[in-house]
Amino acid sequence: MIFSVRGEVLEVALDHAVIEAAGIGYRVNATPSALATLRQGSQARLVTAMVVREDSMTLYGFSDAENRDLFLALLSVSGVGPRLAMATLAVHDAAALRQALADSDVASLTRVPGIGKRGAERIVLELRDKVGPVGASGLTVGTAADGNAVRGSVVEALVGLGFAAKQAEEATDQVLDGELGKDGAVATSSALRAALSLLGKTR
């Protein structure tokens, strides 16, 4: 099991980063908030979890152990795979997720694309007493950029998560045309989080 990766950041994309450690480049799938802390060419460390399947081994990276532990807790729930667990942590930061579980807030969980009412109820039932008390928020906001500059990146990330291109474009445009983009600058990670939340509501 690989618990963390430290080294030079070779690449930062919307859903993953490549970090070179001991001469080996590791592709690490990560949440928008974790990716927002990385800069190409700089040194970085991500706490990781490895998911092993019959035909693959995939690393998932997080800014801290709390997010990694929540990811692993979500994976323990029947019907929740890595993609859905990562989408949950993209929509809700650690503190918000813990609060939703503590409050049995099914409605908040159904904002995550792919989680319906029954799935949310199952997550609450199985994790409410396992995740511990609500801690401080670890949400990191990415560097602001012009809305037009991030549109293509957000659409690409949504398509990568399994949404149809038209659906992804409409959600992204709605986010950038709304309150988030009214000042002409928006963080890519914030736009992606908002689009995911919107898609969860309109599913």
Curated annotation (Swiss-Prot):
* Motif stretch (Acidic pin): 54-55
Compartments, record wording: Cytoplasm
Q: Where is this region: Domain I?
A: 1-65
Going by the entry's taxonomy, the superkingdom of the source organism is recorded as Bacteria
**Per its UniProt record, what CDD domains does this chain match?**
UBA_RuvA_C
- Where DNA is bound, by residue? G79, V80, R83, G114, I115, G116, R118
Does the record carry Ribonucleoprotein as a key word? no
What's the protein here called?
Answer: Holliday junction branch migration complex subunit RuvA
Species of provenance: Mycobacterium leprae (strain TN)
